[in-house]
C-alpha cells in the first residue's frame, strides 16, 4: 500500500478508525482508543496475544506512574471547591490589585484555582464573583468573564495535577515536577494574551454592561461589595493557597537540590538528599496537600462529610483515568509493533521539527472532537513512540506541545464553550465564537509559539520556520472572525 511498511499502515488505519468512532458514533473515547490500539497491533503485524499483552502492559504502566497523582489531585480540588477557598482567592486578589484591575485579578485566580479544580466547576463557582463585580463596578461582564475563563482554561490544559497534563507527562516519560513548573511558566503568556483580548471585548461590545453610575456611586458600590465579601465565612488566603503552593515549593526545592548534586554520587545517597527527594515526589506532596486541605479548610466537617467530599472528587477522575490508560495502551502497541520507529525514520527526513508532531496532532483532534483532555492524550499516545526514536528531541517540550495544541478553537463540541456562553447569556453563534473560540485560539497560538521558541533555545532540532504554523493559522482565523463580525 503506497510502499509503506506494514506497521505504519496499521497506525494510519487505527488513527482513521479512532477519529471516525469518536466523531461519528456513540462509542466513548476510551473504547475507541482500545479498538484503535487493537487495529494498530493486528494490522501492524503483531499476533493477537502480543497485541493484548502490549495493550495491558501499556495501560497498567501508564496508570502506574500517574494514577495515584490524579486521584490525589482531584481530592484536593474537591476540598478547595467546597470549602470556599477558590472564592477567597478571587476576593483577595481583587482587593490587592484594586478597582479597574479586576480582570487581571480574576485571570490570576483562574490561573491558580484551575491547577487542582476542574475547569467547568471552577468557572461555575467563580462566575458569580465576575457578575457581581460587573454590576457593582461598571466593568464589562464580557471582559471579566472571558479573563476568568481564560485563566482557568490555560492552566487546566497545561499544568499538573490536572489529569490531562498528568497523562501526557506519563506517556512521554517526563518528570511530573518538571511538567508542573514548565507548564506554569508556559501558561503565563497565553493568559496575558486572553486578558488583553478580553479588555478589547469591552470596546467591541460597549453596551453589554448594565446600569450607568457616577464615579462616586461606583466607588461606594465597589467598596460595599468587597466589604460584604470579606464578612462572608471563608478560609484565610494563606490557608486557601497553602495546598496549592506547598507542592510547587517542595517540587521546586527538589529540582534545585538535584541540579546541584546530580553529579556527586555521595550526595545522591545521603540522608538529607533522600529526605528532600522523598518530600518532593509528586505522590508525597499531593498526599500532604490533601491532608492539609482537609484539616485546615474543612475544620468543622465530620468524618463522613469529609469522606463524601473526597469521594466526589475521585468520581470525576474515573473516566479520565480510563482514557489516559487507553492512551498508554495505544502508545505501547505503536512502540512494540515498530510503527513508532519506522515513522520516526520517515519524519526525520521531512523539513519539519519533530516537536511539531504532538502539537499538530493535538490541534487536529481538539478541533475534531472538542475535548482538550482526549486531544492531548491522543497526541501523546501517538507521538511519544515516534519521538522516542528520534535523537535529540526534548520530551518535556514535546509534552508541552501536546498540551498547548489542545487549546485550539474551543467551539460547539467543547463543554466549556457552552458553560461560558450560557452563563453569560450569549446566544448568538457569531458572538459565542468571538467570546470563546477566538480567545482559546489566541492562547493556542501564543502557547505554540512559546514552545517552539523554547525548543529553539533548549532543543537541538528546532527551526524558525516552525513558527509559521501557529502564526499563519492564528492570523487566518482572526482575519476570518473579523470579516464575519464586522457588522455586529
Curated annotation (Swiss-Prot):
The keyword RNA-binding appears for this protein: no
Pfam family, one: GntP_permease
Protein topology in the membrane: Multi-pass membrane protein
InterPro entries on file: Glcn_transporter
Chief location of this protein within or outside the cell: membrane
Keywords noted in UniProt: Cell inner membrane, Cell membrane, Membrane, Transmembrane, Transmembrane helix, Transport
Chain segments annotated as transmembrane: 2-22, 27-47, 59-79, 106-126, 176-196, 241-261, 275-295, 314-334, 347-367, 368-388, 438-458, 461-481
Keyword set includes Nucleotide-binding: no
Subcellular location: Cell inner membrane
Family from the record: Belongs to the GntP permease family.
Protein name listed in UniProt: Uncharacterized permease HI_1015
